């Protein structure tokens, strides 16, 4: 029975997307812009193309700086364009 209650509490929160990216701007208060790279294969020619999305992520402690590699997770809308938050800083900029 205890195992069943544990699985139920895990499913309450639901699945959230995570992405890894590079911080390209930290000029806003408690917000960073993260560039997330995605590699896709061209449908007709087969060449691998790099596509980059820039996402605004919430940084509560203002700890991330430009050049840091971070892990971000999807969250509820925090502003008009901010729907991600920083989970951890994987690598600090050199």
Swiss-Prot record:
Would you name any one GO CC term?
Answer: cytosolic small ribosomal subunit
SUPFAM superfamilies for this protein: Nucleic acid-binding proteins
Purpose: One of the primary rRNA binding proteins, it binds specifically to the 5'-end of 16S ribosomal RNA.
One GO biological process this protein is involved in is:
translation
Pfam families, A to Z: Ribosomal_S17 (PF00366)
State the source organism's domain of life: Bacteria
UniProt cross-references to HAMAP family, sorted A to Z: Ribosomal_uS17_B
Q: How does it assemble?
A: Part of the 30S ribosomal subunit.
Q: What does the similarity note say?
A: Belongs to the universal ribosomal protein uS17 family.
Instruction: Extract the Gene3D superfamilies matched here.
Output: Nucleic acid-binding proteins
What is this protein's record name?
A: Small ribosomal subunit protein uS17
One function term, GO molecular function aspect: rRNA binding
Q: Note the InterPro entries from the entry.
A: NA-bd_OB-fold, Ribosomal_uS17, Ribosomal_uS17_bact/chlr, Ribosomal_uS17_CS
Could you tell me the keywords of this UniProt record?
Ribonucleoprotein, Ribosomal protein, RNA-binding, rRNA-binding
């Amino acid at each position: 029975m205890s195992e069943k209650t544990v699985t139920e509490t895990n499913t309450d929160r639901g699945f959230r997307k995570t992405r890894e990216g590079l911080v390209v701007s930290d000029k806003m208060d408690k917000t960073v812009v993260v560039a997330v790279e995605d590699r896709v294969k061209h449908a007709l020619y087969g060449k691998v193309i790099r596509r980059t999305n820039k996402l605004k992520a919430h940084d509560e402690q203002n700890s991330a700086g430009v050049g840091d590699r971070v892990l971000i997770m999807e969250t509820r809308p925090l502003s008009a364009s901010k729907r991600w938050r920083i989970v951890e800083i994987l690598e600090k900029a050199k």
